[in-house]
Every structure is written in C-alpha cells, then in structure tokens.
C-alpha cells in the first residue's frame, strides 16, 4: 500500500477545500520533528478524523520515535483535552505496541525522575481520588 500517496491526497484535499466551519485541528504537513516549520505553507486545517488518520499514516511512512509518540498520544488523550474521534481497539493496540518498542531500553535520568515525581499527576488530591476510585464499579451480592 502506498501510504505516501494516501497522505499526500489527504493533505491536497484539505488544502483545496473551503475553510472548515466545524471543529478543526491544525496539522503540520511535514512534522516539526522532521524539519517542518510553523510557516503557513506547512500547516493545514483538518477535521479531527482526518488529523487522526494523518498521524496514523505518518506512523506507517516514518516509523521513528517522535512520529510514533505523536500518534500514540492522539490515541491516549486524557484529562482536559477531549478526543473528537473514537479509537478502534486494534489501532490503539498497534500504537501502544509501537510506542513500547521505541521506549524499551530508554534510561530516565535522576533529574527527570524527580520532575516526574513532583508532577501534578501525583498531587495529594489526585492520589486521594485514585485511591477512592480503585474499586471501580464492583458487583454487589
């Protein structure tokens, strides 16, 4: 399958159409991690679905850590950012597996470990809520 052609066609369609009036996301045509810039010529407005598909295709064309991580993060959105699309379990599993392969063997410095331990996700409020919610919806009886 020619993923580069599919990606180019997706971007060309988005560039040729009228500006979107619905929810839209800005996408770097050439990812910044691969030398792309924030110039107008390198940006395109995509629907949420198109944006997800674009990152899925990019992860097939360029199986490098930063591109895989961007796709994985789109599959794994949590918190205040609401996902405007549904992620199929097979796609999520694929993204998770690729991300895991690239992270394997990564050494985390002591400085980074300290930053992670002090992060907001480990605040007393969050720890208390996590503890209270561990049981989830348990069956009664």
Curated annotation (Swiss-Prot):
Location of the region described as Disordered in the Swiss-Prot/TrEMBL record: 115-141
Keyword Nuclease: yes
Keyword field: Endonuclease, Hydrolase, Nuclease
Keyword Hydrolase: yes
Entry-linked CDD domains: HNHc
Listed GO MF terms: endonuclease activity
Stored SMART domains: HNHc (SM00507)
Polar residues bias spans: 122-141
Source superkingdom: Viruses
Name of this protein: Probable mobile endonuclease E
Organism this protein belongs to: Enterobacteria phage T4
